Amino acid sequence: MALRVYPTATLPRFPSTLSLRTTKFMVKSSNLQLQMQSNDSRKLVLEVKEKLENEYHSLPVGRNGRDDEDMILWFLKDRKFDVEEAASKLSKAIKWRQDFEVSNLTEESVKDIAQTGKAYIHDFLDINDRPVLVVVAAKHFPKAQDPADDERLCVFLIEKALSKLPTGKEEILGIFDLRGFGAENADFKYLTFLFEVFYYYYPKRLSQVLFVDAPFMFKQFWRLVKPLLKS
């Protein structure tokens, strides 16, 4: 995941074609299907699938479940095709999705917190055809807003971004608009949640993060949270 700081004048450009909004999210298979034609990859996917069935039988099946071969392959790639590590990490991710009730998240369920404008999916893909998740830091007030609502909005928007992936694309772009960021917007706990979500449950989905117009105060705050980043 690449991190870059942009001044206001050089905000990334977006193409002029509007992407369709959706309320029901189905993550497109992209080129994972093509990769699975590799005999070695296919063999490893089946090994993980069998391991999950034998050792984590209580986990759900279906899309984003223990028999979802696209998801299995993605976690194998994340774990450098180590079957044991992929099965372990994926089992925890599936259990988390179940506990967090990810499948029940809807536009309506996050409507109130979304109306603050603190985060949203941009209407356009970026110039590399990646869905764009925008965070407006100056609208985040941890002392006045329910952290559980913030977490649900975060996961809902990640799911929404992934549902907009064009065929052949697998990653999204994150933009943090830091104009007006102050001490009242700093939230160490929420950033910890954000890092953990992308590392454990959506690994390698966030390809790049751009910080726009970062003030000095944020740079000091970032020095404290940067050690939390995992490769």
Annotate each language-model stretch with its function.
Residues 2-204, 208-212, 217-231:
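SEC14/CRAL-TRIO lipid-binding/transfer domains and related phosphoinositide-recognition modules
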